[in-house]
Amino acid sequence: MIAQHAVFPETQHDERARYNFIANLNKHLAHVSQGNSMAFEKRAEPAFKAEHGRTFASKEELQQAMEQDPHYQTWSALRRSTMEMRQQAGRSLPYRQAQELRQRVAAINKVSDSLILNDKVSVPAYLLAVDNHLMPGSYHTEQFAGDVANAANYDGGLFVTTAGLLGKYSDSYKE
Protein backbone atom coordinates (compact mmCIF):
# COMPACT_ATOMS: atom_id res chain seq x y z
CA MET A 1 0.00 0.00 0.00
CA ILE A 2 1.21 3.47 -0.86
CA ALA A 3 1.79 5.91 1.98
CA GLN A 4 0.78 9.55 1.76
CA HIS A 5 3.16 12.24 2.98
CA ALA A 6 2.25 15.88 3.61
CA VAL A 7 2.28 16.96 -0.04
CA PHE A 8 0.92 13.82 -1.65
CA PRO A 9 -2.15 14.54 -3.81
CA GLU A 10 -5.48 13.45 -2.34
CA THR A 11 -7.11 10.58 -4.24
CA GLN A 12 -10.70 9.52 -4.75
CA HIS A 13 -12.02 5.95 -4.95
CA ASP A 14 -11.93 5.61 -8.75
CA GLU A 15 -8.44 7.12 -8.94
CA ARG A 16 -7.16 4.62 -6.39
CA ALA A 17 -8.84 1.81 -8.32
CA ARG A 18 -7.11 2.89 -11.54
CA TYR A 19 -3.77 3.13 -9.75
CA ASN A 20 -4.27 -0.31 -8.18
CA PHE A 21 -5.10 -1.84 -11.56
CA ILE A 22 -2.01 -0.36 -13.21
CA ALA A 23 0.25 -1.30 -10.28
CA ASN A 24 -0.97 -4.90 -10.44
CA LEU A 25 -0.59 -5.00 -14.22
CA ASN A 26 2.99 -3.74 -13.81
CA LYS A 27 3.60 -6.40 -11.18
CA HIS A 28 2.36 -9.04 -13.63
CA LEU A 29 4.53 -7.61 -16.41
CA ALA A 30 7.57 -7.89 -14.13
CA HIS A 31 7.01 -11.65 -14.23
CA VAL A 32 6.30 -11.61 -17.97
CA SER A 33 9.60 -9.77 -18.54
CA GLN A 34 11.47 -12.82 -17.29
CA GLY A 35 10.48 -14.51 -20.55
CA ASN A 36 12.72 -12.06 -22.40
CA SER A 37 15.74 -14.06 -21.21
CA MET A 38 14.29 -17.20 -22.73
CA ALA A 39 13.38 -15.32 -25.92
CA PHE A 40 16.99 -14.20 -26.16
CA GLU A 41 18.52 -17.61 -25.42
CA LYS A 42 16.11 -19.71 -27.50
CA ARG A 43 15.37 -17.46 -30.47
CA ALA A 44 17.16 -14.12 -30.83
CA GLU A 45 20.72 -15.24 -30.12
CA PRO A 46 20.62 -18.51 -32.16
CA ALA A 47 18.96 -16.72 -35.10
CA PHE A 48 21.59 -13.99 -35.06
CA LYS A 49 24.45 -16.50 -34.88
CA ALA A 50 22.94 -18.54 -37.73
CA GLU A 51 22.59 -15.46 -39.92
CA HIS A 52 25.90 -13.74 -39.10
CA GLY A 53 28.15 -16.59 -37.98
CA ARG A 54 29.10 -14.70 -34.83
CA THR A 55 27.77 -13.33 -31.57
CA PHE A 56 26.60 -9.77 -31.09
CA ALA A 57 29.22 -7.07 -31.61
CA SER A 58 27.20 -4.30 -29.96
CA LYS A 59 24.20 -3.64 -27.80
CA GLU A 60 22.52 -2.12 -30.85
CA GLU A 61 22.73 -5.46 -32.69
CA LEU A 62 21.32 -7.23 -29.65
CA GLN A 63 18.51 -4.69 -29.39
CA GLN A 64 17.62 -5.08 -33.08
CA ALA A 65 17.52 -8.87 -32.70
CA MET A 66 15.28 -8.69 -29.63
CA GLU A 67 12.94 -6.21 -31.30
CA GLN A 68 12.09 -8.94 -33.83
CA ASP A 69 10.99 -11.40 -31.13
CA PRO A 70 7.21 -11.71 -30.59
CA HIS A 71 7.49 -12.17 -26.81
CA TYR A 72 9.68 -9.09 -26.46
CA GLN A 73 7.35 -7.11 -28.75
CA THR A 74 4.32 -8.06 -26.66
CA TRP A 75 6.03 -7.29 -23.36
CA SER A 76 7.40 -3.99 -24.67
CA ALA A 77 4.03 -2.87 -26.08
CA LEU A 78 2.26 -3.71 -22.82
CA ARG A 79 4.92 -1.93 -20.77
CA ARG A 80 4.60 1.17 -22.95
CA SER A 81 0.82 1.00 -22.57
CA THR A 82 1.08 0.91 -18.79
CA MET A 83 3.29 4.01 -18.87
CA GLU A 84 0.68 5.82 -20.96
CA MET A 85 -2.11 4.59 -18.67
CA ARG A 86 -0.13 5.76 -15.64
CA GLN A 87 0.18 9.27 -17.03
CA GLN A 88 -3.51 9.42 -17.98
CA ALA A 89 -4.56 8.13 -14.56
CA GLY A 90 -2.15 10.23 -12.55
CA ARG A 91 -1.95 13.67 -14.10
CA SER A 92 -5.40 14.81 -13.04
CA LEU A 93 -4.66 14.29 -9.34
CA PRO A 94 -2.03 16.99 -8.84
CA TYR A 95 -3.45 19.32 -11.48
CA ARG A 96 -6.83 19.70 -9.84
CA GLN A 97 -4.98 20.33 -6.54
CA ALA A 98 -2.06 22.33 -7.95
CA GLN A 99 -2.61 25.54 -5.97
CA GLU A 100 -3.16 23.65 -2.70
CA LEU A 101 -0.03 21.54 -3.27
CA ARG A 102 1.97 24.69 -3.96
CA GLN A 103 0.73 26.20 -0.69
CA ARG A 104 1.60 23.05 1.29
CA VAL A 105 5.12 22.96 -0.16
CA ALA A 106 5.60 26.69 0.49
CA ALA A 107 4.52 26.24 4.13
CA ILE A 108 6.96 23.36 4.63
CA ASN A 109 9.81 25.23 2.94
CA LYS A 110 9.10 28.38 4.96
CA VAL A 111 10.16 26.67 8.19
CA SER A 112 12.94 24.55 6.71
CA ASP A 113 16.26 25.38 5.11
CA SER A 114 16.81 21.81 3.89
CA LEU A 115 16.25 22.75 0.24
CA ILE A 116 17.83 25.76 -1.41
CA LEU A 117 17.50 26.11 -5.19
CA ASN A 118 19.72 28.26 -7.36
CA ASP A 119 17.55 30.43 -9.63
CA LYS A 120 20.47 30.93 -12.01
CA VAL A 121 20.62 27.24 -12.97
CA SER A 122 18.65 26.53 -16.12
CA VAL A 123 17.37 23.19 -17.34
CA PRO A 124 19.73 21.71 -19.96
CA ALA A 125 18.41 21.51 -23.53
CA TYR A 126 18.60 17.70 -23.59
CA LEU A 127 16.11 17.60 -20.70
CA LEU A 128 13.84 20.20 -22.27
CA ALA A 129 13.66 18.16 -25.49
CA VAL A 130 12.12 15.03 -23.95
CA ASP A 131 9.06 14.19 -21.90
CA ASN A 132 10.71 11.86 -19.37
CA HIS A 133 8.58 8.81 -18.56
CA LEU A 134 6.01 10.14 -21.07
CA MET A 135 5.10 12.96 -18.69
CA PRO A 136 4.20 16.06 -20.72
CA GLY A 137 6.43 18.89 -19.58
CA SER A 138 8.71 16.43 -17.85
CA TYR A 139 9.75 17.29 -14.29
CA HIS A 140 10.81 20.88 -14.88
CA THR A 141 7.66 22.53 -16.25
CA GLU A 142 5.85 25.05 -14.08
CA GLN A 143 2.44 26.37 -15.08
CA PHE A 144 2.78 29.10 -12.43
CA ALA A 145 5.39 30.17 -9.86
CA GLY A 146 5.98 27.47 -7.27
CA ASP A 147 4.09 24.82 -9.25
CA VAL A 148 4.91 21.31 -7.99
CA ALA A 149 2.21 19.41 -9.92
CA ASN A 150 4.62 17.51 -12.18
CA ALA A 151 6.78 16.53 -9.22
CA ALA A 152 3.66 15.35 -7.36
CA ASN A 153 2.56 13.43 -10.46
CA TYR A 154 5.92 11.68 -10.62
CA ASP A 155 5.97 10.99 -6.88
CA GLY A 156 2.57 9.30 -6.86
CA GLY A 157 3.20 7.48 -10.10
CA LEU A 158 6.50 5.97 -9.01
CA PHE A 159 4.70 3.58 -6.67
CA VAL A 160 2.38 2.52 -9.51
CA THR A 161 5.18 2.15 -12.07
CA THR A 162 7.33 0.00 -9.79
CA ALA A 163 4.32 -1.92 -8.41
CA GLY A 164 5.37 -0.88 -4.91
CA LEU A 165 8.80 -2.51 -5.11
CA LEU A 166 10.44 0.62 -3.69
CA GLY A 167 8.36 0.56 -0.50
CA LYS A 168 5.30 2.50 0.59
CA TYR A 169 7.17 5.83 0.37
CA SER A 170 9.14 4.81 -2.76
CA ASP A 171 12.34 5.18 -0.74
CA SER A 172 13.47 1.57 -0.25
CA TYR A 173 15.77 1.18 -3.25
CA LYS A 174 18.55 -1.32 -2.62
CA GLU A 175 21.32 -2.27 -5.02
Task: Please annotate each region the language model reported.
Residues 143-153, 158-175:
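Conserved SAM-binding loop and adjacent beta-strand
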Residues 2-148:
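N-terminal auxiliary segments of SAM/dcSAM-dependent transferases
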